[in-house]
Each structure stands twice: as C-alpha cells, then as structure tokens.
Amino acid sequence: MKSIWKVCENGELDELKKRRNEIDQIIEDIPNDGDDMREDEDDISFAAAYCKDHDMGLETFKYLYEECGYPRHCVHYAMVGAAASRNAKLINYMYNDIDEHEKENFIGDIEDELVMTDHPNPSVFIEYALFELKK
C-alpha cells in the first residue's frame, strides 16, 4: 500500500478519500501551532501542494483543509510545496483565502521560496499567480 504522503503527492484524491481514517490520525498527531517543529517535507499538505498535476494538487489541498479539517497553521507547508512545484492556481487560492493583514507576509514568503528553488523570475511568477489568475 502506498504511503499517504505518496497518495497526496500523486494527486490520487479518490484513494485519499478512502483513507480518511489515516488522515484523521495524522491530524490528531500534528503538534499545535508554535510547537510544530517539523520540516516542510514532513507534512502531507506539502505533498498535496507539490503534486505535478496542479489541478489535482488544488483539489487535494481543498479536501485536506476544507473537508478533513487540516490545521490552518500547516498551510505554510503547503505554500512551500506549491512554490516548489510552481502551482500558480494553488498559490492564488491560498492567497485569496487568507486575511488581508497576512497577504504581505504571504507574498514575501512565496518570493523567498521561489528564490530558494532557483525560479528565474519570482516577481513575474507571483504577479501572474496572484493577480493575473483573478481576471
């Protein structure tokens, strides 16, 4: 049986839904905000956002956070995965789902992640992801 992480990374949403009990157990074991010292790659929302199929990555992210009640403090892990996979749709969705006062920090964090993954032009990508996709 594939690991739940691999199922998320591959965007196998139907398989993921069949394994809801495992997701619930993972959620139960996640440290509280402030105590969460895991690496980005240790979080299944990173795996979902890192999915090569960007549409499935977005749908998997929505499933984890909206239907399964995945902890909101873990969204940073998903943001890192979305930046690494260049998932503009998911970045746009995340940006539009946060409070206004968090948006400036979010843009800075995305830019930092894109730079760390050697994106040739982070500011153009961010402009596309956050503003062009709205149109």
Give a label for each model feature.
Residues M1-K135:
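Ankyrin repeat (ANK) tandem alpha-helical domains that serve as protein-protein interaction scaffolds
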